[in-house]
């Protein structure tokens, strides 16, 4: 029987946040399979609703339009998806989304700059047309890392680790028991 200390919060079983390349989608899907629950990637839900990839939404409609879609999608999924949810890396920039994440089982997949650059393919030589994506990644991480850390129920390092091992660690955290209680 659940007690107030061990009862899971209303909302998803777990919500993954972190920078691009952290492994939110990969690890989230593995954790969902281990827990026997469904998995949703908010960016995929946005793409399906918009009928085009996230990158095209940014280019054709602008970042402001994308962020509005992202905020509305995050609100709907946090309120109505009982499984595992992966939010896009920038979803935490929306104050409304941050409020909705309070008290949820938010798993921050902590990723260092070098790993994020490698996982997103930004360590490959780029034509001048693309500017300096590594510098942009550095600015993005500097801006977002404190927000991710502040929202986290649990922080899980991902550098130099296999997704399967990360998922096993997180699934164990989410099993019923004192360590799986709501965020303090």
Task: Label the model's feature ranges.
Residues 19:
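P-loop (Walker A) phosphate-binding loop of NTP-binding proteins
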Residues 103-146:
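A glycine- and Lys/Arg-enriched "phosphate-lid" helix/loop adjacent to the NTP-binding pocket
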Residues 24:
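Conserved lysine of the Walker
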Residues 41-100, 125-126, 134, 138:
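ATP-dependent small-molecule kinase phosphotransfer cores
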Residues 2-9, 30, 34, 143-184:
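NTP-dependent small-molecule kinase module
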Residues 89-92, 112-114, 161:
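Short glycine-rich anion-binding loops that position phosphate/pyrophosphate groups of nucleotides
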Residues 16:
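Hydrophobic anchor at the beta1->P-loop junction of P-loop NTPases
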Residues 27:
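Hydrophobic positions on the alpha1 helix immediately C-terminal to the Walker A/P-loop
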